Design a protein with these regions (language model features):
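Beta-lactam-recognizing serine transpeptidase/beta-lactamase-like catalytic domain environment
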Residues: 1-39, 44-172
């Protein structure tokens, strides 16, 4: 700390102030920075839909390369489409269209409920300073295009710690 503060300033700090000063020097982006998770979200989309009975896990969905929501064509990674895919194949091929079809069956209220159950949009409570909460939609202000893109991890954000904690919950 002596690089940035005088001895007098350091001595005047309580432990919390010192922790904050150290944090500023060695900020932990895994805790403090949020990002759009992308494809790692897809497992949570499937898990919530199965848990709610919106899907059984045995469905086959057609991927034509895009789906239309509102004023938007939202594309899959496979621009020409994957063709018919099981849910497992949809996860393996990282198919955005399969996730959009699943979340359309689940609905925005249940999707948002499961984002919260898995810990997105809230601090984890990890014992490190500077934890961010991430940003998720409320069902009341989520339009169809936002629901579709959230299903494959875009248009919302979380921290790496939230994603790791979410996977811990998912695996259990």
């Amino acid at each position: 700390l002596s690089t940035y503060y005088t001895d007098e300033e350091i001595q005047a700090m309580d432990e919390k102030a010192k922790s904050e000063a150290w944090y500023k020097m060695w900020r932990n982006f895994c805790v403090s920075d949020s990002y759009e998770p992308g494809s790692p979200q897809k497992a949570f989309t499937v898990a919530g839909a199965i848990e709610e009975g919106a899907i059984s896990g045995n469905e086959v969905f057609e991927c034509g390369g895009k789906l239309h929501f509102g004023d938007w064509d939202i594309r899959c990674v496979a621009r020409a489409g994957h063709g018919p895919l099981t849910i497992t194949q949809g996860l393996m091929k990282s198919c955005n269209v399969v996730m959009m079809r699943i979340v359309s069956l689940e609905g925005k209220e249940k999707f948002v409920q499961y984002q919260k159950i898995f810990g997105f949009g809230e601090k984890t409570g990890i014992d490190l300073p500077g934890e961010a909460s991430g940003l998720i939609y409320q069902a009341s202000n989520m339009d169809p295009a936002s629901l579709a893109t959230n299903a494959f991890g875009q248009n919302y954000n979380c921290t790496m710690v939230q994603m790791a904690a979410g996977y811990g919950s998912l695996i259990n």
